[in-house]
Amino acid sequence: MSTQHARQFSRRRFLGGLTLVGTAGFLGLHPRPAPAEPPPETTTLRLVQGLGLCVAPQYVAEELLQAEGFLDVHSVKSNTVRDLEVPLASGDAHLGMHFAAPLVVRLDQADPIVILAGVHIGCFELFGTERVRAIRDLKGKTVAVPDLQTGPITFLASMVAYVGLDPRKDITWVTHPRAEAKQLLAEGKIDAFLGFPPDPQELRAKKIGHVVVNSAVDQPWSHYFCCLLAGNREFVRTHPVATKRAVRAILKAADVCALEPARVARFLVDKGYTPNYDYALQTMQEVPYDKWREYDPEDTVRFYALRLHEAGMIKSSPQKLIAQGTDWRFLNALKKELKR
């Protein structure tokens, strides 16, 4: 056995015996905060459970959150984007990962939430039939979305506005659940569908449609976060130490996703978050989880605010939304603390 192969084998065998929190420590992402940092104001944390596999850092953070002093971590389950947004605004959930464009819409609607950090880029992909080769080809076409007010339609409206189309006039929107929309795309009964993991992985595996836009590599979408971390405004105001500790755990978990995609994929299957290991592994390998230090989430809020304003979905200016709906204190501190 070569020395290099022996090193690789030893590392795999060693990592195989670690929990994910142990992996974080082994990779230099030690879960313990600085000794001088006070304990969290509460040991209970309620996280809204996001949609799709791309929110894996929130799942991986379970043990890291315990190490941060959270003894009682609850998941507030959501089946739709609306289910996700309501608990954050009401305070039934304290924190949670959510898609960037819908968050901007909620800020415009004066929801009492605050965006705290960017977590990753590149999770959504636009699939089309042969009639759609570029975003501009969506003019006059039929596009399926689960909701006409939030969720994928906010990203799609941003995309068509960016290329000069009017989503209110130029697109025929139809509402269908994700499973139905994928089947309609396969049958050619709709022209396009915006998918989030594991939908893109499934569509590619089944050779349904083709990729028109991949936000992990296609500009300008690859320059901006698709998933952000947000919190209930009152919780963040009254629990700053707990907020920082929770943000730290989730951002460290994003690093684990980037560094150990296979182990995270197995974790997601073993924990019941998804039944398909191959789709989970592809998601972990394809979504760039290592950009939270270098990309500026404020740029993301500004970009989507401008696009959604052009699309007629919001009224507020980017400056107002950034001033009232973002708080980068914790992220800025953690960028210094968690330097690579």
Where on the chain are the PLM-derived regions?
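Twin-arginine (Tat) signal peptide motif
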Residues: 6-15, 29-35
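Bacterial Sec-exported substrate-binding components of ABC uptake systems
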Residues: 21-22, 29-43
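Short, glycine-/small- and polar/acidic-enriched structural segments
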Residues: 37-175, 184, 191-197, 208, ...
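Pocket-lining segment of extracytoplasmic ligand-binding domains
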Residues: 100-101, 180-270
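Secondary-structure end/capping motifs
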Residues: 237-316
